[in-house]
Swiss-Prot record:
<comment type="function">
    <text>One of the primary rRNA binding proteins, it binds directly to 16S rRNA where it nucleates assembly of the body of the 30S subunit.</text>
</comment>
<feature type="domain" description="S4 RNA-binding">
    <location>
        <begin position="98"/>
        <end position="160"/>
    </location>
</feature>
<dbReference type="GO" id="GO:0015935">
    <property type="term" value="C:small ribosomal subunit"/>
</dbReference>
<dbReference type="InterPro" id="IPR018079">
    <property type="entry name" value="Ribosomal_uS4_CS"/>
</dbReference>
<dbReference type="InterPro" id="IPR002942">
    <property type="entry name" value="S4_RNA-bd"/>
</dbReference>
<dbReference type="Pfam" id="PF00163">
    <property type="entry name" value="Ribosomal_S4"/>
</dbReference>
<dbReference type="Pfam" id="PF01479">
    <property type="entry name" value="S4"/>
</dbReference>
<dbReference type="InterPro" id="IPR001912">
    <property type="entry name" value="Ribosomal_uS4_N"/>
</dbReference>
<dbReference type="GO" id="GO:0006412">
    <property type="term" value="P:translation"/>
</dbReference>
<keyword id="KW-0689">Ribosomal protein</keyword>
<keyword id="KW-0687">Ribonucleoprotein</keyword>
<comment type="function">
    <text>With S5 and S12 plays an important role in translational accuracy.</text>
</comment>
<dbReference type="GO" id="GO:0003735">
    <property type="term" value="F:structural constituent of ribosome"/>
</dbReference>
<dbReference type="GO" id="GO:0042274">
    <property type="term" value="P:ribosomal small subunit biogenesis"/>
</dbReference>
<protein>
    <recommendedName>
        <fullName>Small ribosomal subunit protein uS4</fullName>
    </recommendedName>
</protein>
<dbReference type="GO" id="GO:0019843">
    <property type="term" value="F:rRNA binding"/>
</dbReference>
<dbReference type="InterPro" id="IPR022801">
    <property type="entry name" value="Ribosomal_uS4"/>
</dbReference>
Length: 208
């Protein structure tokens, strides 16, 4: 399945909530959801209620697009989470949060997950002192993530770091801005992740 290439703003409007796909724009009055908080298209404002299946599908699509994954990747994470001990939905979100591209975004080294993915692919980051260029690389508690020294002058990284206070730093991460380095301290709890999603609907969708 190909990666979704439609307008990021249309994706957010379809889900009628901010998915923070366009970086700083999402925090401004230019955000499409702020101006038109209804699905795009001719009948966007008049759409009726979803069936149970429709709600499950919408929630699955919302989370998948939030993290920028294709269906095959997304389902693989779910299967992995389902095999783990504990609550499947929480396990699932934790796996997504452990991705290095997501952590680069959370630390404020990128303005969006899409930008973080691009930066990781171009080898701008180190994990425990070693270059990693695979966006799906999963971090473990105690792992450090730092910007390669030669990449610390990149405008997009520095602009993202300047805008970081708008988003705030999650409690499971630690950041030393002066050193361009962060630490994945511990696995996040569901409460700490504070995501506006209903992951149980995804569990129900894949459990059929």
């Amino acid at each position: 399945m190909a990666r979704y290439t439609d307008s990021s703003c249309r994706i957010c409007r379809r889900e009628t909530m901010k998915l923070y796909l366009k970086g700083d724009r999402c925090y401004s009055d230019k955000c499409a959801v702020e101006r038109r908080n209804y699905p795009p298209g001719q009948h966007g404002q008049g759409r009726g209620k979803f069936s149970d299946y429709g709600l499950q599908l919408r929630e699955k699509q919302k989370i998948r697009r939030m993290y920028g994954l294709v269906e095959k990747q997304f389902k693989t994470y779910f299967k992995h989470a389902d095999r783990q001990k504990g609550v499947t939905g929480t396990n699932f979100l934790t796996l997504l949060e452990r991705r290095i591209d997501n952590t680069v975004y959370r630390l404020g080294f990128a303005s969006s997950r899409a930008q973080a993915r691009q930066l990781v692919r171009h080898s701008h980051f180190l994990v425990n002192g070693k270059k990693v260029n695979i966006p799906s690389f999963l971090l473990r508690p105690g792992d450090s993530v730092s910007v390669v020294e030669g990449s610390r002058q990149l405008q997009m990284i520095n602009e993202a770091m300047e805008a970081m206070p708008r988003r705030g730093l999650p409690p499971w991460l630690e950041l030393d801005k002066a050193k361009y380095e962060g630490v994945f301290k511990t696995l996040p709890t569901r409460e700490e992740m504070n995501l506006p999603v209903q992951e149980q609907l995804v569990v129900e969708f894949y459990s059929k």
